[in-house]
From Swiss-Prot:
Residues 26-145, 150-272, 293-412 form the Thioredoxin domain. One of its GO terms (cellular component) is endomembrane system. It holds the Pfam family Thioredoxin. Residues 1-25 form the signal peptide. The lineage of its organism: Eukaryota, Metazoa, Ecdysozoa, Arthropoda, Hexapoda. The gene is prtp. Keywords: Disulfide bond, Endoplasmic reticulum, Phagocytosis, Redox-active center, Repeat, Signal. The keyword Flavoprotein does not apply. One of its GO terms (molecular function) is protein disulfide isomerase activity. GO terms for biological process: apoptotic cell clearance; positive regulation of apoptotic cell clearance; protein folding. Disruption phenotype: Reduced level of apoptotic cell phagocytosis. Loss of both Prtp and CaBP1 does not cause a further decrease in the reduced level of phagocytosis seen in either Prtp-lacking or CaBP1-lacking embryos. NCBIfam families: pdi_dom. It comes from Drosophila melanogaster (Fruit fly). This is Thioredoxin domain-containing protein 5 homolog. The keyword Disulfide bond applies.
Length: 416
């Protein structure tokens, strides 16, 4: 068994793996409030297999432990959130009263002990944060998005570095799926005849040059006039469309300014690695063609407003009606809701409604306090605000018609 450093924490959080059996709740779940258990329960026979197959966040506990009992609902909630296909991390637990040898091997000396076992790493990571969902998810996001995971495959890292030769990767129908299947990719979907695409082209090339030393992301492009099926699969409806793709899945549609500095800042945010500025960039980064700026302003109105920080959040909810999605980029349910949320924003704007459709990334450090203040306990959480006052949490169906019907309750008869 690989030797791993121990991460003890009084917080609970684990991801459910579709590859591992879900067992009945142990004595820890003695309240009987939940019939279904989402956390994966491990034993000596399944533990090594689990950590050898992926990232695993383990809670080592004892059923009689009061702190363990208090954290149990939060642990189950995190497991339910992460219960998606191909999860980035498995949320699990080990009953140390049943498996004393296993807990002794991992140097468990107190309960609960929380340790993150990262795929390919010999040492586990100890969670030392507060026992709330934002702190735990922030920990997971930081640990699993960090490039330190490279030692599980220097070969994989070298392959990515070979692509980052200072040029945009030109993708085709034959190469697209394999290229984006693992890692981070910023992809431009374009048409050769599109004037905005033509203006963006040199900046896109410059962005690739800036990332020559950053192996965690590639800058790519695909011609939608030649490879329509790929563009249709990613719901591309206009040119250029810039999508952030992680491990083959669309995470976010970029809708910011298209100058080099702003694009670099966006990449830095997504990969969590500061990028160097180029000489003369400070003077050039604010030069934006008026036509493109106007187009981007219109595009922003058709997409959910990305709120950042307490001041921006307070301003958004101060007047009128604001429908806000609190989410985490790694959350599978959030990813499934994303296209519907974008469509809701588009149709709301087209109906000339005054309601604001927005979103808050709770894993971003600048939003941590916002999500704590708003008592966000799971992802996605949908709150509606009217003149600064929060209404009841929306817990209905996440289909577009149901979301629109909910909004109508708070709007005038002529809206939506």
């Amino acid at each position: 068994m690989l030797t791993r450093s121990i991460l003890s924490v009084a917080v609970c959080g684990l991801l459910l793996s579709p590859l591992l059996p879900i067992t009945r709740a142990s004595q820890e779940e003695d309240t009987g409030k939940q019939d279904k258990q989402f956390t994966v329960e491990l034993d000596p026979e399944t533990f090594d297999t689990a950590i050898a197959g992926g990232n695993v966040f383990v809670k080592f506990f004892a059923p009689w432990c009061g702190h363990c009992k208090r954290i149990q609902p939060l642990w189950e909630q995190l497991a339910e959130i992460m219960n998606v296909d191909n999860p980035k991390v498995i949320i699990a637990k080990v009953d140390c009263t049943k498996h004393q040898g296993l807990c002794a091997t991992h140097q468990v000396t107190g309960y609960p002990t929380l340790r993150l076992f990262k795929l390919g790493e010999e040492e586990s990571v100890k969670f030392k944060g507060t026992r709330d969902l934002p702190a735990i998810t922030d920990f997971i996001n930081k640990e699993l998005s960090a490039p330190a995971e490279a030692d599980l495959g220097e070969v994989k890292r070298e392959q990515v570095e070979n692509l980052n030769i200072g040029k945009v990767v030109d993708l085709t129908e034959d190469t697209f799926a394999k290229h984006v299947s693992t890692g981070n990719h910023f992809v431009k979907f374009f048409a050769p005849w599109c004037s905005h695409c033509q203006r963006l082209a040199p900046t896109w090339e410059d962005l690739a040059k800036e990332l020559i030393k950053e192996p965690t992301v590639t800058i790519s492009k695909i011609d939608c006039t030649q490879f329509r099926s790929i563009c249709q699969d990613f719901e591309v409806k206009g040119y250029p469309t810039l999508l952030w793709i992680e491990d083959g899945k669309k995470i976010e549609k970029y809708s910011g300014a298209r100058d080099l500095s702003t694009l670099k800042t966006y990449v830095e945010k997504m990969v969590g690695v500061p990028l160097e500025k180029t000489a003369g960039e400070a003077g050039d980064e604010k030069v934006v063609i008026e036509e493109v700026a106007g187009e981007e302003d219109a595009a922003k109105k058709l997409t959910p407003q990305q709120l950042t920080g307490e001041d921006e959040f307070d301003q958004a909810i101060a007047e009128g009606v604001a429908f806000i999605k609190f989410y985490a980029p790694w959350c599978g349910h959030c990813q499934k809701l994303q296209p519907t949320w974008e469509q809701l924003a588009t149709e709301t704007h087209q109906a000339q409604s005054s309601v604001k459709i927005a979103k808050v990334d709770c894993t971003a450090p600048e939003n941590k306090q916002v999500c704590i203040d708003q008592q966000v306990e799971g992802y996605p959480t949908l709150f509606l605000y009217k003149n600064g006052q929060r209404q009841n949490e929306y817990e209905g169906s996440r289909s577009l018609p149901e979301l629109q019907a909910y909004l109508k309750k708070f709007l005038g008869h002529d809206e939506l």
